[in-house]
Amino acid sequence: MNVIKGVVAAPQARVAIAIARFNNFINDSLLGGAVDALERIGQVASENITVVWVPGAYELPLTVKTLVETQKYDAVVALGTVIRGGTAHFEYVAGECSSGLSSVAMASEIPVAFGVLTTESIEQAIERAGTKAGNKGAEAALTALEMVNVINAIKG
């Protein structure tokens, strides 16, 4: 039986991080976790990490698509935070962001990791950005690296 398993170490990987500025008091922690995970656990050199800031989560899919199309990166990590409010705005932004990022990932051969928090409250977002529930930015970064290795192993 042939089993393919990914590892997270990818020292030669070139990784782009697209991050939303809206809710940056939370997203800054996601970014810190992602960069730390890439460098410390994934062994990615800092010069191989590019960070691109965009206004909000809705702008992430187009930005990630553009990054993927440059063919400069082995993986892209999308980071942001969408917090439910009193209107339907949450559903539109969260849904389009998720759908758009998924479409980019499926249309390309480059892993796109989803590190966008979609929470019911600010407290939930803070918990997922490095306190009680870990750091989802770090998790997304490690997912991106593991997928780089899995895809490379599948392609042989």
Swiss-Prot record:
| Any one of the GO BP annotations | riboflavin biosynthetic process
Q: Which protein is depicted?
A: 6,7-dimethyl-8-ribityllumazine synthase
Q: Which family does it belong to?
A: Belongs to the DMRL synthase family.
Has keyword Ion transport? no
Disulfide pairings = none
Q: Where does (2S)-2-hydroxy-3-oxobutyl phosphate bind?
A: G86, T87, R128
Which Gene Ontology terms cover its molecular function? 6,7-dimethyl-8-ribityllumazine synthase activity
Please name the catalytic residues of this protein.
H89 (proton donor)
Q: Which residues bind 5-amino-6-(D-ribitylamino)uracil?
A: F22, A57, Y58, E59, T81, V82, I83, F114
**Which ranges form a coiled coil?**
none
Recorded GO cellular component terms are:
cytosol; riboflavin synthase complex
Q: What does the UniProt record say this protein does?
A: Catalyzes the formation of 6,7-dimethyl-8-ribityllumazine by condensation of 5-amino-6-(D-ribitylamino)uracil with 3,4-dihydroxy-2-butanone 4-phosphate. This is the penultimate step in the biosynthesis of riboflavin.
A Pfam match: DMRL_synthase
Q: Which organism is it from?
A: Photorhabdus laumondii subsp. laumondii (strain DSM 15139 / CIP 105565 / TT01) (Photorhabdus luminescens subsp. laumondii)
